[in-house]
Every structure is written in C-alpha cells, then in structure tokens.
Amino acid sequence: MQNNFTLLAGAALAALSVSASAQDLVVKIGHVGPTSGAIAHLGKDNENGARMAVDELNAKGVTIGGKKAKFELLAEDDAADPKQGTAAAQKLVDAKVNGVIGHLNSGTTIPASKIYSDAGVPQISPSATNPKYTRNGYKTAFRVVADDVHWAAPWASTR
C-alpha cells in the first residue's frame, strides 16, 4: 500500500491544485473502497493502509516549493456498488481532492474513472483488473496490478 500511496502522492503533486494557507499546503487524497457489505474487510484494510501512509508522510514533514505539505485522507465507502461508487467519486471531486486511491473492484472503478478523468483527478486503482479500466483512454487512470488479459496468459500456459 505504501508504494501505491507514494505513486498517488506523486501524481497528485504533479497535478497540484492544493489549498494553500500562509504556511502549509494541504494535499487532499481520496480513498474509495467497500467499507460496508460483503467485502468490507478488503476495503477497510486498504483504507487503513492509506491512513498509515498519510500519517507517515505527515510525520516526515514533506515540503513542496519550500512550504510544508499536510496530507489529508478523505475516505468514502462504495460498498462495491457502481452507483455508490460514482456518487463517492463525485463527492471527492467536489471536495477538490488532488488524487484518489481506489476503487477496489473493476465494477466500481470503471464508471468512477470517467468522473475523475473529466475533473482531471489522478486515480490509482490498487486492484481493478478489468482491461477496460486503462483502455478507456483516460490519462488520469492508473493501475497497480496487471489486467485480466495479462494474468490469464501465464495462468493458462500452466494448465
């Protein structure tokens, strides 16, 4: 999770539209996953990893352009439901997040990716494997794991 978060933090910083006070920059990172429903344990684990990464970054005292950056995590539950997923995506876009970690499954990731793309918000899915996610042509959509096509070939060759 730390590597995923580091990638997202870098993407968010590259697209930096942070809120600035006199002293600190605030970098808002969104997290969306199922924290309710049948696979809530996976979403909660993922969110906990993101919270740990935010805490570590804030403890390090990261600076951007000579100003101390404060990272904030805005977490939303999509319950692994596409309708809730798009509502969560819009909520994070409206909150002006700098980047998003999520969604956890392809069924919520794909419809949410258009919302993030339209808003110019980088999105990194830690586990969506449907090839459509990164083949839709959205420049803000990134994946951490291989898609189903890449997973299937090596698996099929061992059968």
Where are these regions (language model features)?
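Gram-negative bacterial Sec-dependent N-terminal signal peptides
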Residues: M1-A22
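Aromatic/hydrophobic pocket-lining residues that form π-stacking "cages" and hydrophobic walls in ligand
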Residues: A11, A50, A112
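Immediate post-signal peptide segment of exported/extracytoplasmic ligand-binding proteins
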Residues: A20-H31, I64-K70
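Extracytoplasmic "Venus flytrap"
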Residues: G30-R51, E76-P82, L104-G107
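Sec/Tat-exported extracytoplasmic proteins
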Residues: G33-I39, V54-G61, V93-K96, I101-L104, ...
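Signal peptide-proximal N-terminal region
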Residues: N48-E72
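Structural motif
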Residues: K68-D94, W151-P154
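Extracytoplasmic ligand/sensor domains, especially the bilobed periplasmic-binding protein
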Residues: V97-R159
